[in-house]
Amino acid sequence: GEVTVVAPSGNQSGTGCSISFRKSVNVNQVPSRVDGVNCFAVRGTPADSVILGSKYILEEDVDVVISGINPGFNTSRNMFISGTFGAAIIASALGMRACAFSMDAVDPVDDFTVANVITAITNELICSDTPPGSLFNVNFPTIPVGGIKGVEGCAPARSELKMTVDLQSD
């Protein structure tokens, strides 16, 4: 199949499912690091990227939307403020299969192991009878290369959403 990347042009941590309402959103085609892959940078949120990619950039139906991979877990209630998971939620709401991928920390060596697992999961989503609108959230712990033994499904935990605020005066 054909792969197209439509992603925010900068970090969008904490944007959740937000869209750029009453604001301009710019899209630019950018050079790809992979032959045959078209890449677009969106000056907007991850959700904006999904909407623009699926409705305006791509001419065919989307088989699956992959969001991420980003450093830091998107587990429990934290996933609801995650831009990575937010993009997957919007894709699912638009009727596409979607999966958000996150990992505890970025490690160039472990990234190759994770890439193989992401490829396998993506292929399963495309080739299986996974219904349109299905939504998945996959988090990889920091483990040695080759340490991934499988994928386990679970419901999100119901932990407290803890946030800190650094108050400053003008």
Residue ranges, per PLM feature:
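Glycine/threonine-rich flexible loop motifs
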Residues: F73-S82
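Short glycine-rich anion-binding loops that position phosphate/pyrophosphate groups of nucleotides
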Residues: N11, T45-P46, N70-F73, I143
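Glycine-rich phosphate/pyrophosphate-binding loops
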Residues: S92-V114
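Alpha-helix C-terminal capping segments
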Residues: G53-E59, G86-R97
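Short beta-strand segments
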Residues: A7-P8, S67-N70, F101-S102, V138-P141
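A cross-family phosphate/adenosyl-ligand binding-site feature
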Residues: E2-Y56, E60-D61
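Electrostatically charged, flexible surface regions
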Residues: T113-D170
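Short, Asp-centered acidic motifs that coordinate Mg2+ and/or phosphate
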Residues: V64
